[in-house]
Amino acid sequence: MKHIILVITLIISSINLYSQTTEDKDKSVFNGYDGGMMLHTGYVKANIKPLNYIAEGASNGIGGAIRFHFGQHYRIGTEGYVSTLNLMNNGSYMKTFWAGLINDFYWKIGKLMPYAGITIGGGALTDCFIFDGDNHDWEKESNVIINKKPFVAIDPIIGCDYCISESIHITVKFDYLFGFNNKDLYLPTGPRAYIGFIFFH
């Protein structure tokens, strides 16, 4: 954990230093903002040790981001997502919510705008496991486990926009969410792919 925090600190420091250098060179500090919504899906997996159960499958969800542009390559803002892994075909699920501060670099290459960065924040994992019955009736279920855990979220990202125009982009990105808690956190992990529209101002 200490090594991860050190790496993140170095990344953010490098971003800030590069941003300041770029701003001085281009004589422009604030260069607008962008924001939009994205859908995502990805294959995730978690070993739920207290239940001796391995949860895996497609986790789908939605979310969005807003970022402010400084210099010619640096953005800082906030983003948040919710992602649900449905299990057992009976209403069981693992729902992950996370949000935080996003820092990234971007470059414009013709109609393309690749970017890479990291989001640091927090989230919550809500689990519902139905081992007897399902959610398709009004019967009381006798064997249901519900658990909710907060966590520190660290989410590296890489992606690319296709610039339809100066103000409208289609974005595709990939991430891998890491969660940290003092104990008993069984966060489904794996790569996620996102697609959405981003509007620039």
List PLM regions with ranges.
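Gram-negative (and chloroplast) outer-membrane scaffold detector with strong preference
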Residues: 68-140, 152-154, 162-168, 198-201
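Sequence/structural signature of outer-membrane beta-barrel proteins
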Residues: 40-50, 81-90, 123-127, 177-183
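Short glycine/proline- and aromatic-enriched beta-strand/turn motifs that initiate or cap beta-hairpins
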Residues: 19-70, 74-76, 200
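Predominantly the C-terminal beta-signal and adjacent terminal strand-loop region
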Residues: 154-201
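Cleavable N-terminal export/targeting peptides
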Residues: 1-30
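Residues that define the transmembrane beta-barrel architecture of outer-membrane proteins
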Residues: 31-33, 56-62, 93-99, 112, ...
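Transmembrane beta-strands of outer-membrane beta-barrel proteins
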Residues: 34-42, 79-81, 115-121, 173-175
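Outer-membrane beta-barrel domain signature
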Residues: 26, 47-55, 88-92, 143-148, ...
